[in-house]
A protein has these predicted regions:
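Anion-binding and metal-coordination hotspots
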Residues: 1-175
Length: 175
């Protein structure tokens, strides 16, 4: 069988083996390893530089957009006419912003009765950025039977199988 690891499992693997430096990957952007958490399985870490740059760009855009809106809330707390007051009112506005952009995990928020402040969690952002463009293929087949390149190709071909099943299930099926 061939499968892939989900993001939390990839983060756990990166913590176990140290950060995956770009120099560790060969010219095919593949790295084979094993883990005690997945006994008897081969793990192939793949790096997609285009996906990495896209995720980094998107994350930075979302962080910037979140900061712009959070700054507006901070200003609303300090304005002289009708200042925003009360922890519940401030928290409600802040919650709407961080929920909209899904960036709560990257900000440290401080809300009091009369003030609001925020700052980026640089360590969390750096940790997430280290995993940009990485995905891990997991297989039970030995290397003699299926090498790393073939495992990646087989995993990518699963998308075609999924597409075929999806089209089989559609209502537009005509016999």
């Amino acid at each position: 069988w061939i499968s892939s690891l989900r993001a939390p499992q990839i983060a756990q693997l990166a913590a176990e083996h140290g950060p995956f430096q770009p120099s560790l990957f060969d010219e095919r952007n593949l790295l084979e390893l094993s883990s005690e958490h997945f006994p008897g399985e081969r793990l192939v870490v793949c790096r997609n530089p285009l996906l990495a740059s896209e995720r980094a760009r998107k994350r930075e855009e979302l962080l910037a957009a979140t900061e712009v809106d959070l700054a507006k809330i901070a200003v609303a707390c300090t304005r002289s006419r009708h200042p925003l007051r009360g922890e519940p009112a401030i928290a409600l506005r802040v919650g709407r912003i961080v929920d909209r952009f899904h960036m709560a995990k990257h900000f440290e928020l401080t809300i009091t009765r009369t003030t609001f402040s925020y700052r980026r969690k640089v360590q969390a952002i750096t940790a997430e950025a280290a995993l940009d463009g990485l995905y891990v293929i997991r297989t039970s087949l030995p290397a003699a039977r299926l090498d790393a390149n073939a495992a990646v190709a087989a995993y990518k071909s699963l998308a075609n199988v999924e597409r075929a099943f999806r089209s089989m299930k559609t209502v537009d099926l005509h016999v």
